[in-house]
Amino acid sequence: QPLTRKDYGKIINTKHFDRLLGLIDSNKVVCGGSSDRNTLQIEPTVMDNVTFGDAVMQEEIFGPVLPVLTYDSINEAVNNIHAMSHPLALYIFTEDKHVAKDVIARIGFGGGCINDTLIHLATSEMPFGGFGESGMGGYHGKTGFDTFTHYKSIVDKKTWLDLPIRYQPYKKINNKLLHMFLK
């Protein structure tokens, strides 16, 4: 009973709460699905027999809703994913390292896990972020600092030395000297 626990998380605001409820098709819920608008809580919800046409598959979820889609082959799954915009994350569950490597190589996504979910967000050593429709850049740790930092490059040329070699007309000796310095 997650909704009765004091330590169970809340949805950030009513707009997001209502958006999430709009993604849940009660006819496809196999567990969870309860919610409390007063506390902005939604029970972890698993939906089965989901298709790419369902509302829950039309946008990134960012909430306690797990749509389950089934496939007859990995190629079918990859082709269906390619028909959509790039996912922010990809989670593949398999014991077969070759299948995992193949899927990861064939699908563009921001970050992900093999045989787990969300754990890639827990380390500041790994950047997280999307590309394409899911965003740009990376966040977390040094990568996040670098993403949101503007580096200002400056050259402080002293005025007491202004080499004529920099200016036209160029002479053959100038080219030879430049090549010698650039080696």
Specify the residue positions occupied by each region the protein language model found.
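Conserved C-terminal structural/oligomerization subdomain of aldehyde/semialdehyde dehydrogenase
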Residues: 41-183
